[in-house]
Amino acid sequence: LETTTARQISRVQLNAARGGACSWMRDSQQLLCHLVDPRRGRAPEKPMVPSGPIIQETSGRVGAIRTYQDLLKTPFDVILYDYYMTSIPTLIDVGSGRTTQLASRGIYASFSPSPSGDYFLVRERVKPYSYLVPDGRFAEEISVVAADGDLVRELPGKPLQEATIVGGVPVGPRNIGWMTGRDQTLTYLEALDGGDPNADVEYRDRLMRLELAASPQEVLRTEFRYAGLSISESGTGFLSEFDQPTRTRRLWRVPMDDPDAKELLWERNSEDRYGDPGTPLTMLNDDGHRFVRQDGDWIFLTGAGASDQGDRPFLDRFNLETGESERLWRAGSDSYETMVAVLDDDANRILTRYETRAEPPNFYVRDLESGQRTALTDFPDPHPQLSGIQKQFVTYERDDGVQLSATLLLPPGYVEGQRLPVVVWAYPREYSNADVAGQVRGNPNQFTRIGGYSHLFFLTQGYAVFDAATMPIVGGNLANDTYVEQLVASGQAAVDKLVDLGVGDRDRIGIGGHSYGAFMTANILAHSDAFRAGIARSGAYNRTLTPFGFQNERRTYWEAPEVYFSMSPFMAADQVNEPMLMIHGLADNNSGTFPIQSERMFAALEGHGATARLIMLENESHGYRARESVMHTLAEMVEWFDVYLKNAEPRRITF
């Protein structure tokens, strides 16, 4: 950095197929890198004739897993996987360029240094692979090696995870990693319920501790599913556990040397954003590991600060002995400001990201004692020509009393009382009860940034946008039993509110969404006449093709066939009587949203005489990245609503 010149450290070929090819060691003098085997040779060529059939077999083992994409499909895929993923873990001295090979060539899921850098936790993927699950579920051999490459200890491996059910966890050791502040200590988890969330047991998990030269020891057991552990430099652990059926989350204070003395700090509904006390603040230590910042009996908490006025992030001090909480900072009510980092041990100086409706996000250093704010960046408005966009936060009510909300955006030059074509954009979410479903999310003071294929581009074409309109599906684990009814009610409430505000008229309001929002769009058009037209991007429309669960639905198709059927707009394609535009990436790798979902939905619509258009984008995934794809998507969306919404003839009224 002093000379601003770059130099080559070593003449090696890095292997970045698995992600980051190099990472810094603690001393900042060495890099841990994954290298290509110099003897690897040219990539294998696909044989002209298949080597044999593709075979899968099951033998009575239950394995209800979700649908995945981009999996290994053929024996040749296995050969390519081995070729590209094989690497040699190596230490490279930055000063001299000297290399130290740490292990033989293999396929490594991770190669993690201990806090001191003297040891490495090695997770190596081994055969047999699977055609059913992604490589993160492949079998692994696990061991610890020293910095000179010598084997220190072999650990229990991870079996192939083809039988882990939806909502469950693997059987055997999982989440193994170095314990913060301990150079020769590992922690890992073991399921006590066989990995089955439906099993009726006293405890779900147990946390284990393993000294490299000793036998494993049980630290504690959790009644709910383990959800995370952070440790302070003084050795105090903060352990979280979560119960999905009740949405209950607990946070425990655990002295790691005396875990029997653990103390419950709080138990709360994870969906209750208003009541969230925050999350313990973590910082990086000299070892490059995260630890909870603790000052005597005090720790720091950060959170979104959700309220009925929107999110106002905060930083608190929390006393572990008294339960007393002291507010150090809270974002103002006329802006949106998030805390990025604490800059000193006493949390007197913090780095924040500040924005308003008129000012784009910039970074500032805040001195909490003096109140002074110092700008670090001065990023300009990326689109000043759109600075006249008007924004207001809107609340309204569904016919069953559930509170709803959205952000109404009006185009530059809008005159009050003018009725515009309106685009309602939404994404449904499930909740356990109506109170938490009605809580406000987001902040109306955020800067409106328009980019990519955002639906906010409609603001440049004379449309109003009813953004992030809430579509809550209330009812806990059985919420989807009334999915369609609640969805239609939420959509109707949005239309009624827009009409009451004097912004829209019932003949020119459209609905749109991406992914689960596309699923929502198709359902609303099938079961309601509230909207004039719709846009559905990268969606799934036939839930029988995701038979082992989706979103928060844990029941399988065979456990709740009527729910899967009634929720699938494909089954109601004959009822879709509003124009629908569908867009999908041909390389969509998102679980459940196979491109065939859009292809079959379009075929069903065409077969019943509906007005529809299907756009399949080559080489695009769940989101679209190529400039050509982004521009084409925007053009299709605007043209569709221009024809079937903005300039559409009034609908006939029948009696």
What are these regions (language model features)?
Residues 15, 25, 179-181, 418, ...:
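Extracellular/periplasmic catalytic domains that process cell-envelope and extracellular macromolecules
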Residues 1-388, 403, 438-439, 651, ...:
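Beta-propeller folds
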Residues 142, 186, 265, 363, ...:
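Conserved hydrophobic/aromatic pocket- or pore-lining residues that grip, position, or stack substrates
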Residues 410, 418-429:
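Short beta-strand element of the alpha/beta-hydrolase
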Residues 429, 435, 439-655:
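Active-site-proximal cap/loop segments of hydrolase catalytic domains
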Residues 145-150, 210, 214, 243-246, ...:
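Secondary-structure transition/capping motifs at alpha-helix termini
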Residues 377-418:
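N-terminal cap/lid segment of alpha/beta-hydrolase-fold proteins
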